[in-house]
Amino acid sequence: MLDFYADWCISCKEMESYTLSNPEVKQALADFVLLQVDITKNNADDKAFLKAFNLIGPPAILFFNLNQQEQTDARVIGFQGTKTFLKHLSKL
């Protein structure tokens, strides 16, 4: 699971505070490896990273299979509440 976030991103803070910190979500993510991409600086490297994944900005969560291939249909773009995110995870 690759989580794109920025300190200035309000939706990222909401996702962290309300959704990703929820005990049910934490349990559902127990078997996932979480990597985070901090694009707070929004510099050339950050923009290149976003472009490489065809993203316009955070928040965005990407999921990969065991062969390190992105599951593009599983992308989460923008804020999702706990129930919606748990439902999404159940389909992976």
Which ranges hold each PLM region?
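Hydrophobic beta-strand anchors of alpha/beta hydrolase catalytic cores
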Residues: 1-2, 34, 61
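Loop/turn elements at helix/coil->beta-strand transitions in domains of secreted/extracellular proteins
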Residues: 30-35, 58
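Non-catalytic, surface beta->alpha helical segment in thiol-disulfide oxidoreductase systems
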Residues: 19-24, 56-92
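Short active-site neighborhood of thiol/selenol oxidoreductases, capturing the structured segment around
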Residues: 1-9
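Short, solvent-exposed loop/turn and secondary-structure capping segments
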Residues: 13-14, 47, 73-75
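Typically the conserved alpha-helix immediately C-terminal to a functionally engaged Cys/Sec
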Residues: 11-30
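Structural alpha/beta surface segment adjacent to cysteine/selenocysteine redox centers
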Residues: 44-58
